[in-house]
Each structure stands twice: as structure tokens, then as C-alpha cells.
From Swiss-Prot:
Residues 1-152 are peroxisomal. The keyword Chloroplast does not apply. The gene is PEX14. GO terms for biological process: peroxisome organization; protein import into peroxisome matrix, docking; protein targeting to peroxisome. Residues 174-507 are cytoplasmic. InterPro entries: KPWE_PEX14_dom, PEX14, PEX14-like_M_plants, Pex14_N, WH-like_DNA-bd_sf. Residues 1-10, 32-48, 288-302, 378-394 have a biased composition (Polar residues). This is Peroxisomal membrane protein PEX14. Induction: By wounding and hydrogen peroxide, but not by jasmonate. It comes from Arabidopsis thaliana (Mouse-ear cress). PANTHER family: PEROXISOMAL MEMBRANE PROTEIN PEX14. Residues 308-322 have a biased composition (Low complexity). It is a single-pass membrane protein.
């Protein structure tokens, strides 16, 4: 530890020397430590990187250390401050080397005035301040002594006192203050209720208004809920009525559909009565002429053929989406509208025959008529007229009936009833029919129906047993040739048919 050498002041200032000798011993070691840290330079380390010293930072540190207030502060505080500012240890040491701390003897300065008078001024450094803080441990000692005298039973006693005081306070509030407060509130409420003037003049409070508004809102909500519930019930009833109405309408529509279907069936059955057709049937002006069906016994029974029903089911209604004519027909019609002539169509002479034209001598035998089937070929002179002879080709159509005999009887009967002019008109022989324009149509007409379609018709006719029975009766009657009770049987058939019509309409 370095020793501090005091410079002896001149003999002219004995008092100053005495004052310096009276410096407290506590401050001397501090100054000695400060000067020792400045005098002793730390040895440079071999492993430490040598960095260049920043002159500007050193100048700032010198200015900081040269400040009079900073000079009295401890060296440790000054070093830590400079380190926080970013100065290295070498720079701090260099700054302290350039600005050394003044020795303690330099704290006493002598000033000489111009007039020769001397004035002694003593500057007390800030390093003397820690000497005042020396009696601080004397203050802490009484507190430690007081704490040492505090015991655990003191804490228990304090807790007991606090608990007793709290319990007493609670009992006092419960038995004295609360009953008085309640009685005071009740008295005020009774005064307000018994005073009618105040009650009449007093305006409702916000709470009362809120309660009244809430009651009104709840009443309105209940009314709305009741009205909405009634509306829902009414709507449900209306929906039920509407569903019942739609159901009744649907039932009526179904009945109307069934009635229309029955009417169509009846119309189809009346139009599909079995008749005897051939390819050589005579057609004039779009109307087919057929004679009444006589019977071999000479009886001429005229009955309504529409009263009988056909065994075949009515034709299925055509699909509305399908075109009314095939594509080939539409193509031909479009070609005709454009003025083109189709390749497979021949022009036909459809001019009406000349009634004044004399009859030509036929070179070939006339074609047989439908009623000539079933007769043996005989000579015209011996067997009557030519239309009564049987054509050998009649078996091609599959019809072998006794209509020739019936027609003969009918001819004999009607010849006496018809006038002479009508008989002369019937004696006219029509010309030959025009050639067939579409052979495919004739072939389709003559071609028998496929077995699948026949099965479908048979299945559809199972539900029409009554109609089939009537047709069987009519067929048997026609095959028997008609006996004496023919008129009675036909009348019975007509009555049964009318009864079935009435029963279907009732359903």
C-alpha cells in the first residue's frame, strides 16, 4: 500500500498545518486507496487483444473527470459510469492518468489578494460525506433489540383481541343497529301508504313505470300469441278443407275418367262389330253400302247392330306426343307441297264414270261378292244371277258363310217392296275398282295379326265376359241360320245389353 507524502506548507501558515493534522483518520484510508488504484497500473495481459485507443472518447472522459462535482465521487462510481458509456479499460486508465486525483494537502488553498492580505479557504471534499453516515449502525441496533423482545404469545394475544372486538361489533350491529334501521324503514313506508294526498300527488317512480310497461308488454305478447295460435288453427282447418275438396275433386275426376273410358269402350265396341269384309268391297264417295243380313229361312230380322259389343278390346288411345302420321307419310306430303312427285306413286284416274256410256261386253267373268261364298260353281242359266255364284278364290279370305242364301231370300223379299226405278238403278254394274296405289297397305290389311297382339286382346277381353257372351249368342244365332225364335233371341240380347249399360252408368 503506497504511503501518502504530505507537502509541508510554509511556516507562514501554521494554522493550516494544524487543520491538516486534524483530518479524520477515516478519510485517510479512502484517499490512499484511490491514489493506490491510480498509481498501480494493471499488468497487460498476453491474451488480450490490443485495440486502438479512441482519442475522442478519452477527451470526453477527461472532461467528465475534470468536473468539480465528479472529482469528489468515488473512483469505482466514475469507472462504472465510463464503462457504461462504452469506454474500454485502457481508455479509462488513460483518462485517469491524464486527470489525476489531487492529493489531500491540495485541498487547502492559499489566496493572496492584491493588497497583500491573505485569505485561507478550506474546501471540504465530497469524500468526507461517508464520515457522517458512520453512526447509521447505531439506529439499526434498537430495532433489532425491539424485535428480539417480541414473542409468539404476543401474536396470539393480538389475534384474540381482534377476534373478540370483531365479534362484539357484529353482535352490536345485529342487535341494536339493524332492528332500529328496520323499524325506521317500516315507519316511513306506513306514512307513505297512509297519506292519501301524497299518494295521489306522487308521480310513479321509474321502477313502477318499468313494471307497468313490462305488464303491458307481456299482455300484448300474450294477445299476439293467442291471435297467432288462432290463425294457425284456422289455417290448419282451411288446409284440411282444401285437402278434402281436392280429394273430392280427384274422386270426381277419376269417376269422369272412368265414365269417359266406358263411353269410349262402348263406342269402340259398337264400331268393332264383326263384319265380313273383302278386298273387293264396293266403296262409293267414301260410304260403304251393305245390305241387311237375311237368313236362309226367309226371315228378315232388322236389329240395331250397335247394341252388340265386340269381343276385341277398344283401341288404345293414341299418344298425344306421337305424330298423327308416320314419317314416310310426312315426307311424301312435304314433297307434294314442294311440287315434287314421289317415285313410288302413280297417277290414278279418279274421274267419275260416265253414266251415259254404254255397257261393254265383259270378256272375263265378274268377281265374286262376299255373299257368294259357300256356293258351288254353277251355270248362270241354271243357277240364277252371276252374283249368286261362288268364286273359287273366296277361300283365300277364310270366309265360308251362308250369306248367299240369305241374300237370295232378301232379294226376293225386297224386290217386291222396292220401286221399279230403284231396281233399275241396282241393275247397273259398276266399273272395275282402280288399281291399288300402295301395295304395302293392302298387304298389311290382309296379313293376319301377330300372336302377341292376339294374346293381349284375349287378356283384355277377360274382363268383358258379358260382352263375349252376347257376341257368342249373336254368332250362334247367325250360324244357326235363324229359326222361328230369332226375333225373341235378339230382343233378349238387346235387353241384356241395355241392363249392362245401365249398371255401368250407375257404377
Amino acid at each position: 500500500m503506497a504511503t501518502h507524502q504530505q507537502t509541508q506548507p510554509p511556516s507562514d501558515f501554521p494554522a493550516l498545518a494544524d487543520e491538516n493534522s486534524q483530518i479524520p483518520e477515516a478519510t485517510k484510508p479512502a484517499n490512499e486507496v484511490q491514489q493506490a488504484t491510480i498509481a498501480q497500473d494493471p499488468p497487460t495481459s498476453v491474451f488480450k487483444n490490443s485495440e486502438p485507443i479512441r482519442e475522442d472518447q478519452i477527451q470526453n472522459a477527461i472532461k467528465f473527470l475534470s468536473h468539480p462535482r465528479v472529482r469528489g465521487s468515488p473512483v469505482i462510481h466514475r469507472r462504472s459510469f465510463l464503462e457504461r458509456k462504452g469506454l474500454t479499460k485502457e481508455e479509462i486508465d488513460e483518462a485517469f492518468r491524464r486527470v489525476p486525483d489531487p492529493p489531500p494537502s491540495s485541498q487547502t488553498t492559499v489566496t493572496t489578494s492584491q493588497d497583500g492580505q491573505q485569505a485561507v479557504s478550506t474546501v471540504q471534499p465530497q469524500a468526507m460525506q461517508p464520515v457522517v453516515a458512520a453512526p447509521a449502525p447505531l439506529i439499526v441496533t434498537p430495532q433489532a433489540a425491539f424485535l428480539s423482545r417480541f414473542r409468539w404469545y404476543h401474536a396470539i394475544l393480538a389475534v384474540g383481541v381482534l377476534a373478540a372486538s370483531g365479534a362484539g361489533t357484529a353482535v352490536f350491529i345485529k342487535r341494536s343497529l339493524i332492528p332500529r334501521f328496520k323499524s325506521w324503514v317500516q315507519r316511513i313506508m306506513l306514512e307513505e301508504e297512509t297519506d292519501p294526498l301524497k299518494k295521489a300527488d306522487a308521480k310513479p317512480s321509474l321502477a313502477e313505470e318499468a313494471v307497468a310497461a313490462a305488464k303491458a308488454a307481456s299482455a300484448a305478447a300474450s294477445d299476439v300469441a293467442r291471435v297467432s295460435q288462432e290463425m294457425m288453427i284456422t289455417k290448419n282447418e282451411e288446409r284440411k278443407y282444401f285437402e278434402d275438396l281436392t280429394h273430392l275433386l280427384g274422386v270426381q275426376v277419376q269417376e269422369m275418367k272412368s265414365l269417359s273410358n266406358n263411353i269410349r269402350k262402348l263406342e269402340g265396341q259398337s264400331n268393332n262389330i264383326p263384319k265380313i269384309y273383302s278386298a273387293d268391297q264396293e266403296v262409293y264417295n267414301g260410304s260403304v253400302t251393305t245390305a241387311r243380313k237375311p237368313y236362309t229361312n226367309g226371315s228378315n230380322v232388322d236389329y240395331d247392330t250397335r247394341s252388340a259389343r265386340s269381343a276385341s278390346p277398344p283401341a288404345a288411345p293414341a299418344d298425344s306426343s306421337a305424330p298423327p302420321h308416320p314419317k314416310s307419310y310426312m315426307d311424301i306430303m312435304s314433297m307434294i307441297q314442294r311440287g315434287e312427285k314421289p317415285s313410288n306413286i302413280r297417277e290414278i284416274n279418279d274421274m267419275p264414270p260416265n253414266p251415259n256410256q254404254p255397257l261393254s261386253d265383259p270378256r272375263i267373268a265378274p268377281k265374286s261378292k262376299p255373299w257368294d261364298y259357300g256356293q258351288a260353281p254353277q251355270d248362270e242359266s241354271s243357277n240364277g244371277q252371276w252374283w249368286q255364284q261362288k268364286n273359287p278364290r273366296s277361300t283365300d279370305f277364310g270366309y265360308e258363310t251362308t250369306t248367299a242364301a240369305r241374300f237370295t231370300a232378301n232379294q226376293n223379299e225386297t224386290s217386291t217392296m222396292e220401286p221399279a226405278a230403284f231396281q233399275r238403278q241396282r241393275s247397273w254394274v259398276p266399273p272395275q275398282p282402280p288399281p291399288v296405289a300402295m301395295a304395302e297397305a293392302v298387304e298389311a290389311i290382309r296379313r293376319p295379326k301377330p300372336q302377341a297382339k292376339i294374346d293381349q286382346e284375349a287378356a283384355a277381353s277377360d274382363g268383358q265376359s258379358g260382352v263375349s257372351d252376347e257376341l257368342q249368342k249373336i254368332t250362334k244365332f247367325s250360324e244357326s241360320g235363324g229359326d222361328g225364335s230369332g226375333g225373341i233371341k235378339i230382343a233378349e240380347i238387346q235387353e241384356e245389353t241395355e241392363q249392362q249399360h245401365i249398371s255401368q252408368e250407375g257404377n
